[in-house]
Amino acid sequence: MFNLKNFLLSSSLLFSVFSSPVFSNPKVLKVGAIPDQNQDVLDKRFNLFSKELSKQLDVEVKYIPVINYVAAVTGFRTKDLDLVWFGGLSGVQARLQTPNSIVIAQRDIDKEFKSVFIVNKNLELNSISNIKGLKKLKNLRFTFGSENSTSGRLMPEYFLNQAGVEIKHFKGKKAGFSGSHDATIALVNSGAFDAGALNKQVWENNLKNNPKRTSNLELFWITPEYVDYHWVAQGDLENRFGEGFTKQLKSVILNLDINKKSHKQLSLIHI
């Protein structure tokens, strides 16, 4: 349902962020990312990433946080963002709206990405071995992540549909939209929802590093593989930063190495 108050708030926040003086400086490389996790996690990750880019490219790089997936796509379309970490769906949306934009990099795991379905332990539902078992989620309170998330909504809904489960089959004939993968974990763990779907990497990271956040959860099913996250850049960066800049930018990103201590801190490589 359209919410005018939220739309106006989002619009005003977008205006205040994208009207900052940094956006009038053509020599600043502006980096963005879809907000698929808690903001403090994203801020740490992409500020470190921006510092690494700045160091290796010898240009000023600024990370610009956005409030939602739509803002990331909009910021890229209006050229207020130069380089954005998109998911599969949001990346397609951004490129369709931004002529000459290009995909410049992708992690190896993103070629074979997966989502997971999780359930609250109180349901006492056993994990399933094939897609047909998703029918067990009918009549439950179910939440996706963001509506524009590939791993948190698009692909999970696709697999649900393949199993004959539609949104109308959930309790209340609707699904929730938590806004992010971390929020999905929190909502199902608390019992606010019975089940949910999210990014497999975020799930595994929380299992390892935040066991309290997953204490009431069970893994229900892991999806088949699909293509997801990638870096998308504006097609005119060389007009601002010089000939060969895009190739150099691509090389820096692709040469990030998890085995290097300084690069390992950029959890973007493996999360």
Identify the meaning behind each predicted range:
Residues 28-46:
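Extracytoplasmic "Venus flytrap"
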Residues 47-58, 146, 150-177, 205-212:
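Ligand-binding cleft/hinge of the Venus flytrap
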Residues 63-74, 87-89, 168-186, 227:
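Short helix-initiation/N-cap motifs at beta->coil->alpha
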Residues 85-98, 161-162, 187-190, 194-215:
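A ligand-binding cleft/hinge motif common to bilobed small-molecule-binding domains
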Residues 100-110, 171-174, 206-226:
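Short beta-strand->loop
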Residues 107-163:
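A conserved helix-loop-strand patch within extracytoplasmic ligand-binding domains
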Residues 115-126, 227-241:
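A bilobed periplasmic-binding-protein/Venus flytrap-type ligand-binding module shared by bacterial periplasmic
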Residues 269-271:
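Conserved small/polar residues in nucleotide/adenosyl-binding loops
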